[in-house]
């Protein structure tokens, strides 16, 4: 566990709320920004960040206006912007690999100072390389995602008491949009094992390559999504 995760992390949060108004108009404004980071360690040979880093910015505004004694307008606006950075595989998969892996089978990687001349991390494994190495899964790539959610609503209420006492007309229209852009990149880990050979000097240990990998990130895997939803409502009330 300690080989993969840091002992602590720092998160930041900022909020600002403003409200006010008078007899004709009232308003409420809320702005917030959160920055949450994860506990995942980053491989020293990587030039990218695989640790979780989530930045969220939120804006909410409500405005109520009494145009006349019988006409009222309410406007609501909400937006959420989120930027996510994290490993190319899900956190659930990483924790699942941690539970399945046997720490006595092999090290997460073999130390660099003992293996000069390599330009990549020497991830540990054994056999044919089919054993889970949670550290390799965690640091082999990253995912970058940006999402944007916007909601707008306008409501108009008209009192028709000048026609008939108790008669009201209300109309409401809203739109919700959601967009998402996601990029994921990763490399294929090099897996190595440790073997023993008996020589005249005794038993020597040497590294052998189990799986060929790559020293570069693959082309981005791009996923885009955009949706819009409209809603209209018109109601006549008579009490």
Regions found by a protein language model. Give the residues of each.
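Flexible loop and strand-edge segments within Gram-negative outer membrane beta-barrel domains
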Residues: 2-32, 36-39, 50-131, 143-145, ...
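Individual transmembrane alpha-helix segments
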Residues: 138-142
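Asparagine-centered polar/low-complexity signal
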Residues: 15, 133, 232-234
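Small-side-chain secondary-structure face that scaffolds active or pore-lining regions
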Residues: 34-56, 86-88, 93, 145-151, ...
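Extracytoplasmic gating/loop element in the C-terminal half of outer-membrane beta-barrel translocons
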Residues: 129-131, 135, 198-203
């Amino acid at each position: 566990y300690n080989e993969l995760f840091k002992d602590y992390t720092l998160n930041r949060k900022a909020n600002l709320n403003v409200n006010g108004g008078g007899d004709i108009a009232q308003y409420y404004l809320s702005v917030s920004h959160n920055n949450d980071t994860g506990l995942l360690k980053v491989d020293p040979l990587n030039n990218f960040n695989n640790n979780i880093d989530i930045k969220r910015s939120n804006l909410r505004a409500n405005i109520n206006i009494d145009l006349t004694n019988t006409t009222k307008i309410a406007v609501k606006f909400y937006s959420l912007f989120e930027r996510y950075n994290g490993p190319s595989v899900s956190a659930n998969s990483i924790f699942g690999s941690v539970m399945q892996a046997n720490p006595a089978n092999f090290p997460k990687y073999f130390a660099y100072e003992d293996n000069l001349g390599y330009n990549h991390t020497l991830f540990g494994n054994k056999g044919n390389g089919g054993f889970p190495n949670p550290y390799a899964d965690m640091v082999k790539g990253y995912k970058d995602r940006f999402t944007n959610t916007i909601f707008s609503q306008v409501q108009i209420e008209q009192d028709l008491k000048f026609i008939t006492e108790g008669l009201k007309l209300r109309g409401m229209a809203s739109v919700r949009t959601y967009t998402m852009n996601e990029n994921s990149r990763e490399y294929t880990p090099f897996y190595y094992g440790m073997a023993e050979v008996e020589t005249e000097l005794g038993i020597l240990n040497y590294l052998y390559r189990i799986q060929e990998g790559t020293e570069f990130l693959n082309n981005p895997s791009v996923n885009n999504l955009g949706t819009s939803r409209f809603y209209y409502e018109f109601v006549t009330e008579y009490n």
